Amino acid sequence: MSPEVTLNRISPALSPFISSVVRNGNVGLDSTSCLRITDLKSGCTSLTPGPSCDRFKLHIPYAGETLKWDIIFNATYPELPPDFIFGEDAEFLPDPSALHNLAEWNPSDPECLLLVVKELVQQYHQYQCSRLSESSRLMFEYQTLQEEPQYGENMEIYAGKKNNWTGEFSARFLLKLPVDFSNIPIYLLKDSNEDPGEDVALLSVSFEDAEATQVFPKLFLSPRIEHALGGSSALHIPAFPSGSCLIDYVPQVCQLLTNKVQYVIQGYHKRREYIAAFLSHFGTGVVEYDAEGFTKLTLLLSWKDFCFLVHIDLPLYFPRDQPTLTFQSVYHFTNSGQLYSQAQKNYPYSPRWDGNEMAKRAKAYFRSFVPQFQEAAFANGKL
């Protein structure tokens, strides 16, 4: 249900509280998932005019789960705070003395409901952490992470019995990884949603039993970061090693991700250096180039009155990954009507060369390759 539809059904006196929740309702680590409202109902009589819904179910993303709490207002007395029913979490009993925004409910503040929800989620986190005491191994995982502020302050935990018949215990840890994305080139981040939220990496680690014999990690990247690093298939985290623990595994994933970010940043600056060197070496032979991401360059060259184009595609992880050179005749066509071309990746290359050395080596390779390309164009293409 869209925020607009939700607000149109809410009692007008309660609408400011609900608007703040559905429009600004980010709680917890996952900034890409907002609070949602469903199951709108009214406690008013059927004679009450206009929109009168004053109770609903609030969906809260938490540690890879979705908490579903019922919130019950009284539209007849909208100045009163709501009641809460915590659904399947019947054992969750919040400490009223820690719910300051509920005890000091301020109906003139549109954010008062959102503030109470945040306080409740904090207490819910403490409740879940306390449940880990059923497993000494999982409690060890929690305590060692908690001792490191960079992890302990950015962690959500969901624990419980996976199987009520066997009593088997399981838990999921969700951690916001302390990785700096601020230096990723802007052009890689612009193709995103209108409101992409925070750039974040979340690591979910599920323990399917109390002794940690089955552990399944999974990495979640916010949309802009996933796009900047080359898509969902570009980053594979290692399996959780047998006998390992989170305090050893999490830094490994952080380092892996940090290295990927550095490769992308380095690739951007190296591509810019590469294209600058080609502009210097080939001058007026440069037809066009990508002046934003420095990912493409096209040259118009000639050899013994044979003119040809060279399209150079520089990959995201350049210079680790080698550029592709595509030679294209300006005279010859294929049967499908396209200019005859050949792509080459088997040419002298070293990621350790600077841009100037790469340009010099490329020029030498062009001279050595163009005779056979010309011959192939005449043999396989049509004028």
Curated annotation (Swiss-Prot):
One GO BP: cell division
CDD domains linked to this entry: BRE
GO molecular function, one term: polyubiquitin modification-dependent protein binding
Region annotated UEV-like 2, chain positions: 275-364
DNA damage keyword on record: yes
InterPro entries registered for this protein in UniProt: BRE
Main location: cytoplasm
Cell division listed as a keyword: yes
Domain notes: Contains 2 ubiquitin-conjugating enzyme family-like (UEV-like) regions. These regions lack the critical Cys residues required for ubiquitination but retain the ability to bind ubiquitin.
Official protein name in the record: BRISC and BRCA1-A complex member 2
Organism annotation: Xenopus tropicalis (Western clawed frog)
